[in-house]
Amino acid sequence: MRQAGIRQWDDIEPNPPPLLNNWSYFWEDIYNAAVDAREAFANGNLQFFTQNLKPSDRWRLLHLKLNQTTFIDIETSGLESLDNYITTIVAFDGQKLHTFVKNENLEDFPDFLLTLKLIVTYNGSTFDLPKIMREFNLPNIPVPHVDLRWLCHNCFLDGGLKNIEKTLNIKRPEDIRGTDGNDAVILWNQWANSNDHNARRKLVKYCAADTISLLLVARKLLEIHHCDNVPDDDGDPWRALDQIPQSKTNQTTPVQNETCNTQHSINDRLKAFLNKKRRH
């Protein structure tokens, strides 16, 4: 098609160019697909492209919408158990970290998800997103999604996110460079069971680092595909980790939160019962 002068949707006319006359019998489908794609892009319907582009071609969405992309990672209470639960979710929009922690504000995540344009994960198709759907009882993920694992695979980059980082020379801050998913489980237990605020902060920081790494990997992939006009990098994205507050001694542990919530519920029911008795 390039030899026929077709490089973008607007170059596709109702009739095929002379060089592609042998495509006449299915040209109408090509033309209609181009019309649909133009309309979807004009309307900001990115779901159209995640549904119609091959996984290996979805890097094109990153090229066009990187500044509207949110990078998401989750941590769970265990790596193998089927009944594990989400402990932490971090979302990074390239500027700001959005943190959701169990028994604090994790239940706010579904509403936050609805505000996003495009989400990116690493291996999220088989891990993060099914976990999110199960945790929040969602029938589907209501936001277009790109899984960097498969984009990396098509660039001959395989393995976990840490292996990809090594290959692409992406270096995490030293204090979390050796931390992995197993450590995240231990850190959660230290926070939940022992009120270890430093463990909570390191857990959130580790999860946040994964999301920042996703942005850096995405940029490297766009370089591999020789993309131009990529949105400018606003300095060192690792500086976003400074947004994570220092540990606060007045924070309640998850167990304390549950106790407080239970007590509030009991108090509310007791007040309702007493008010009802007064009316009678």
Stretch-by-stretch model annotation:
Residues 1-280:
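DEDD superfamily 3′-5′ metal-dependent exonuclease/proofreading module
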